[in-house]
Amino acid sequence: MNVKNEHMNKFANGVLFLMLGQTLSKGVNFLLNTLLVRYLSPRIFGITSFLEFLLSTVLFFSRESIRISTLRIKSTTDSGKLEKVEDGEDTRTLQSLINFGYIPFVIGLPLSIILISWQYSNLNSYFIDLPYFKASIFLIWLSILIELVSEPFYLVHQYLLNHFIRSKYESLGVTFACVANFIIVVWFEKMVNGVGLELHDDYKQEGIAIFAFAVGKLVHAMTLLACYSYNYYSEVYTTGERYSYKLTKIRPETRQESYYFQNDTVQHFKKVYFQLCFKHLLTEGDKLIINSLCTVEEQGIYSLLSNYGSLITRLLFAPIEEALRLFLARLLSVSSKKNLWLSMKVLIDLTKFYLYLSLFIIIFGPINSSYLLKFVIGSKWSSTSFLETIRTYCFYIPFLSLNGIFEAFFQSVASGDQIFKHSYVMMLFSGIFLFNCWLFIEYFDLSLEGLIVSNILNMALRIAYCGNFIHKFYHYLLKESSTETTQSILPNISTFKNVALIAAIIGALDWYFIGYVENMRELLINVILALLLLILVIYKEKSLISELLAAKTYAA
């Protein structure tokens, strides 16, 4: 099989498996949350989103830098005699991955205790006094530790590009967690809590809802650990122990000293860790801001906004970003002009796809989203500003998605010094973001709309920085290529400009004659307009689509 097509096939399969896993798990999550939202108030969504932020922050700071650093781990197959396994990787490389998998737990244990204790002491007494709240906090902490225990298994499957196994286990974990959450809330409402103003206890309802959320997180973590453990021990039973789950010293066949961790990977981990800390604070900084500048009800509204507004981001863009990061890290680990051209082609095609999709989101999202979602949310949310704010959030999604692939590229190829420099830039962006939040939320009193505008400006700065890095990266490595060759691979901006102009005209006419959609007839008109625009895009990019389909068919 052609090397180029083999890489493309792995990338395409990775995107497919991750996307299917995300679609299944998030689809179940979306369905059950849609049913739950009628039982829960904005205040409950606010506190659960805060707990979700705590959990994701501890997990991110504990494991994300290790996940990225181990993609660059050096295989010992490059020198000396090899002790091969079926997948083409030697046992020493896999054992090194297992060893690195223990670092997240070592970081996460003290970090979780410190962060949760600190935030618990600052919580409103109303939430602390809720029934089962202390038990919920303990379950959240326990779920963090259990999920970190499964990290060594995850690193092995990530390195071997076993997307199917990872997506399958993650889908099971999310599905079981959502079902457990849903069963507890609905069972309590139907069987325990009374009906009517005299019998129904909103205070207990809020307590049990938070407890159900915590149980769901625990079920998710336990499912992941059980699945990965079963996979490991079943392989041990059928093929013998290829590597040990225990922390094991690695003894190379050369005269080098034995080690637990590869030194180059450790050094890269140290440099990337602080850069990722700033990235996470910028990415999740909106949650920190709303915790300090917004009411609990507004926090709940923003949580629901993130769930519904970024659904396409989590279903489509997140799998592409992850697969791209893994694909580039493995592809560019070997210095080759052919690999450089392939990576550039993939990045350009993805960028064009994102830009076209952004046109549809910007034109049809704001005017249709409120009408579609009003059937989903219950009466508790109809009186809030949710339906108005979702229109503004639609403009944020394209920036969020485009930044995702640009930063995925940066993380895959940047050197330690470039990552260190990026950390200082992220510090500057953090300051600008905080100032914009104060300006739009406090000074102009724009509330959640101000937060969304601040996020858009933040993402624009990050896109500009990574875009400049990508340009310099390829310009430096491909500077010996002829101008004609370089120009031939650049995106056809004129085609996109023509489509964007027609899309803008369609959007203007749609807004002038219809405006915000209020009935099924207007919704149907918008669907027809979107289909016409889609046909135009396919026609204009028919050569690119044919090329991609031909490459996929050949690789298969």
From Swiss-Prot:
Keyword Mitochondrion: no
Position of the signal peptide: none
Origin: domain of life: Eukaryota
Membrane topology: Multi-pass membrane protein
Keywords attached to this entry: Endoplasmic reticulum, Membrane, Sugar transport, Transmembrane, Transmembrane helix, Transport
One Gene Ontology term, aspect cellular component: endoplasmic reticulum membrane
UniProt-listed Pfam families: Rft-1
Localization (cell): Endoplasmic reticulum membrane
Cited function: Intramembrane glycolipid transporter that operates in the biosynthetic pathway of dolichol-linked oligosaccharides, the glycan precursors employed in protein asparagine (N)-glycosylation. The sequential addition of sugars to dolichol pyrophosphate produces dolichol-linked oligosaccharides containing fourteen sugars, including two GlcNAcs, nine mannoses and three glucoses. Once assembled, the oligosaccharide is transferred from the lipid to nascent proteins by oligosaccharyltransferases.
Protein name as it appears in the record: Man(5)GlcNAc(2)-PP-dolichol translocation protein RFT1
UniProt source species: Kluyveromyces lactis (strain ATCC 8585 / CBS 2359 / DSM 70799 / NBRC 1267 / NRRL Y-1140 / WM37)
Name of the gene encoding the protein in the UniProt record: RFT1
